[in-house]
């Protein structure tokens, strides 16, 4: 990444070139999650249940690692934009060291917490045993994972999006290959069942990290990791956490929302819980291109902000907003025209499909306007304004949608929950625009 490339290349092709690798990476990761679940489901239903119960804690650990990584990436991009390579290198070194420490703490904490956590959700001794066996191995690799994600965000911070794309693909593809070999004992490998799935996940992370280490050694970067930068810089650490903590909470909030809405919908019918689950599976793919664009925008907007290119910062924001808006408009059209086919991909129950069609058509009314809050969150994180980004996410996932869902469901029944989605998106867009205007001056 050089000054000419980041400061002078036309904004649209620049963001597109940064975003496309991210979109591909996220698609590969989504495919991996589906394939991994498929292989575990072949072991037994209890194994799949155990995997599902462990997932929230895995998601929590990943949220911490990725959220802090966003803070690393933001500081690197801003410092490089300001021409301060020394501070950028110090941010990368501090971030990597702290990420490794987070991994050690997560290993200890998650392994200790898991038995008690599983007991909260099931009394089946076999499921608990499978969950403990799987999670213990997975969390032994936590330091590898946090270090891995730290390198990923360092590469993103300097604009090496293709490197992170290839790295993620190396990890995911190796995991997909190893899953059947280690789970079922193909060839020279012993059959290890659910432990095999956990080892495959860990080895995928190892291969990913090895790839990043090789690239770091052979490819010159504008930041260097060095022991001389390890002396604690309290102000820099505070800046890393000022984005990292809100970033982690932003990633964890959707899980909190789903849990709350599941409890609300279960009072009406279990089929509504199924519909919500299907919607979030679909949402992953519908929002994926927009999320990739926002990820690609983060280092670009941070770099230009650090360089004092304020007019270009505004242009980057608006181009990203328009790109996200077009994608969400396409998603809206798809949900309005073929909702039955979308629901039919995940269930064959006619009643669930009929109710799901209505749900999709109501929820998608908020897709287009949601591009405002999605873009604002990414821009604010890229500018190092983590707290402002968290305020937008809190409005979107808790403060507005939950009261709206409770009030509307008491009047309209379960359908009221679906209306709460677009209402929350519309009101949050107003909050996001107001905050963006104050911070960015859009």
Predicted regions and their residues:
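Short alpha-helical transmembrane segments in multi-pass integral membrane proteins
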Residues: 1-19, 76-143, 189-245, 301-366, ...
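Residue-level signal for short hydrophobic patches within transmembrane helices
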Residues: 8, 12-31, 35, 57-64, ...
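Transmembrane helical elements of multi-pass membrane transporters/channels
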Residues: 17-36, 137, 171, 204-208, ...
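Helix-terminus/linker motif at the lipid-water interface of multi-pass membrane proteins
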Residues: 27, 31-49, 118-125, 181-192, ...
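Small-residue-rich hydrophobic transmembrane alpha-helices
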Residues: 48-108, 145-159, 163-164, 262, ...
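Hydrophobic transmembrane alpha-helices of multi-pass small-molecule transporters
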Residues: 60-63, 107, 175-180, 209-213, ...
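Short runs within selected transmembrane alpha-helices of multi-pass transporters and secretion channels
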Residues: 69, 138-156, 164-172, 197-212, ...
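Structural signal for membrane-spanning alpha-helices in multi-pass inner-membrane proteins
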Residues: 110, 153, 179, 183, ...
